[in-house]
Regions:
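Short, well-structured beta-strand-loop connectors
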Residues: 51-64, 83
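Conserved hydrophobic positions within beta-strands
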Residues: 79-81
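Hydrophobic alpha-helical positions that pack around
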Residues: 193-305, 311-316, 327
C-alpha cells in the first residue's frame, strides 16, 4: 500500500536551521521547584507513590506504572514534596502531578544502582523499572515495544532528527556514542534480534563517522546514511528506506519485522544499564528567531517552560509571539509557560511576533505542490474536498489515516493555506467515524 501511495512522494527540502548543532549541552540552573506529571507517556498514567512532606532524591521512584502500557516516574531533583495535585495536560485531560521544592543538593537516591541483567526476563524487568519511553516524542513505553507479537529481525534506530531547529539527538550521538552502542547491544543480546540499522540523515557527517568508528568491529550493527529530506524520520518512511519493507495498513512496525527506537531512547537505555539512573533529565534544544542564546540545555524533568526559556533569554527588541514545544513543524504551540517539561520534550522554539503571525490565506490554485512534496504521497486537495463533504468512504480511499501531520503541505503551499490543520481535522474525523462504524 505504501509504495502505491508514494508514486510522487518527494518530501520537502526545508531549511534545517540547526544553529545549535555544535552546542554541547550544558546544565541549566536548578529551578526552585519542579512539577512532575504522572502521565508522560502513551497509556495509563502512573500512580503517585509519595505524599506532601515526603523527602525525595534524584532517581527516587515517585510514580508506579498504572498498567501494562504505562511507565514508572522518577524524581529529577532532591527536595521535599510540596503537593500531589491534579494538573491539566495540553490535551485537556487531567492527571496527577507531584510538585517538589528543590533543596539545591541534587542528592542521588541510594537505591540507584546498575540493574542485574542475566536473561531476557531480567532485561525486560529492568527496562520497565527504568520507566523508559520513546524519547522522540511519542512516549510509548519501551518495555512494551520490546515485546512484540510478530517475529522481528531488525532493530531500527531513528537518528534522522529531520525536525527544524532540533539538535538534541545530534548532541546525544556526538557525546554518548558508547551509551548508544551499549543500549543497542543489550537489545540485540536479550531479545534475540539479529541485526540493527542506525538511520542518520547525511547532513550529520560527524555523527555518521563517529558511529561508524564505534561499530566497525560489530557486524550486527549497520550505520546507514539517509537523504536529508523532511519526513525521513517518520516510522513508515524509515522502515521503507532502511530494511526496505512496507508496514501493512494499520499495522505496527513489528508487522514488517522491525522495532524502531529513537537514538536518545537507546542511549538512555545504555546509561541505565550502566548506572541505574533513569531518565530524570534530558537535553532540550532552545532556539528560534526570538531566542537570545540558542543552545542545548540539560533540563531536569518537570522544569517549567518559563524557567527553561529564561535561561536562554529573549532577544532584545523582539516581542515573543509564540513558543512551540518540540519541533517547529510538528510541535504544538504552548498556551501556558508554567507547563512542565517531560521525558519527551526535545525542544522549545521561541518565535517572534512577526514570524508567528498567520499569513494571508488565498484560494487554492490547484498547483499540486502539496501532492508532489507529501512524503506519504497523499493528496491534500482531494482530502479537503472529501472532508468538506464529510465523505468517510472517500477519505478512506484517499488514505487520510497515513498522514502524520509533518507540515510539508503547508510549507510548500504558495497560497499559504492551512493544509496541515485541515489534514489533521480530516484524519481525526475519519478515524472517529470508523470507530463508530459510520458510512463505510
Amino acid at each position: 500500500m505504501l509504495n502505491k501511495l508514494k508514486r510522487a512522494a518527494l518530501g520537502a527540502h526545508t531549511p534545517h536551521d540547526k544553529a545549535t548543532a555544535a552546542s554541547k549541552p550544558v546544565p541549566m540552573p536548578l529551578p526552585a521547584q519542579v512539577r512532575i506529571l504522572m502521565s508522560q507517556h502513551i497509556g495509563a498514567p502512573a500512580k503517585a507513590l509519595v505524599k506532601k512532606g515526603d523527602e525525595v532524591f534524584v532517581g527516587t521512584k515517585i510514580g508506579e506504572a498504572g498498567g501494562f502500557v504505562s511507565a514508572n516516574i522518577h524524581s529529577s531533583v532532591s527536595g521535599t514534596v510540596a503537593a500531589v495535585e491534579p494538573f491539566r495536560l495540553s490535551n485537556g485531560r487531567m492527571c496527577d502531578s507531584v510538585v517538589i521544592k528543590t533543596d539545591g543538593k541534587q542528592t542521588v537516591d541510594p537505591a540507584v544502582k546498575a540493574p542485574e541483567v542475566t536473561d531476557k526476563a531480567s532485561f525486560l524487568a529492568a527496562v520497565r523499572e527504568s520507566g523508559l519511553v520513546g524519547l522522540g516524542g511519542a512516549g510509548f513505553p519501551t518495555d512494551v515495544k520490546l515485546q512484540p507479537k510478530d517475529p522481528v529481525d531488525t532493530l531500527l534506530i531513528n537518528a534522522s532528527e529531520c525536525e527544524v531547529w532540533l539538535t538534541s539527538d545530534t548532541q546525544e550521538m556526538l557525546n554518548c556514542a558508547d551509551d548508544i552502542v551499549r543500549g543497542i547491544e543489550a537489545v540485540l543480546k536479550y531479545t534475540g534480534i539479529p541485526k540493527c540499522v542506525i538511520g542518520i540523515e547525511n547532513n550529520k557527517p560527524e555523527c555518521i563517522d563517529l558511529l561508524c568508528q564505534k561499530t566497525k568491529d560489530k557486524p550486527a550493527i549497520e550505520v546507514k546514511p539517509l537523504p536529508s529530506v523532511y519526513g525521513t524520520g517518520a516510522e513508515l518512511i524509515l522502515i521503507e528506506k532502511c530494511p526496505g519493507r512496507e508496514v501493512p495498513h494499520g499495522g505496527l512496525p513489528a508487522a514488517a519485522g522491525a522495532i524502531v527506537m529513537n537514538v536518545t531512547s537507546v542511549s538512555s537505555l545504555g546509561k541505565y544499564l550502566a548506572t541505574g539512573m533513569p531518565v530524570v533529565s534530558r537535553v532540550i534544544t532552545v532556539d528560534g528567531d526570538a531566542c537570545e542564546k540558542p543552545q542545548n540545555l540539560i533540563v531536569p524533568v518537570g522544569t517549567s517552560y518559563e524557567d527553561v526559556l529564561n535561561t536562554a533569554g529573549l532577544k532584545g527588541g523582539v516581542t515573543l509571539g509564540k513558543v512551540v514545544a518540540g519541533g517547529a513543524r510538528m510541535g504544538p504551540a504552548v498556551r501556558d509557560l508554567s507547563y512542565p517539561t517531560t521525558k519527551t520534550t526535545s525542544g522549545l522554539i521561541m518565535l517572534s511576533e512577526a514570524t508567528a503571525q498567520p499569513p494571508q490565506v488565498n484560494p487554492c490554485i490547484r498547483c499540486g505542490r502539496c501532492v508532489e512534496y507529501c512524503p506519504m504521497g497523499l493528496e491534500p486537495v482531494e482530502v479537503n474536498q472529501a472532508y468538506a463533504a464529510r465523505d468517510v468512504q472517500e477519505l478512506g480511499k484517499l488514505h487520510v489515516d497515513y498522514c502524520f501531520n509533518c507540515g510539508s503541505c503547508t510549507f510548500v503551499c504558495p497560497a499559504k493555506r492551512p493544509c496541515t490543520q485541515m489534514m489533521g481535522l480530516a484524519k481525526a474525523f475519519y478515524l472517529g467515524e470508523i470507530k463508530k462504524g459510520g458510512n463505510k
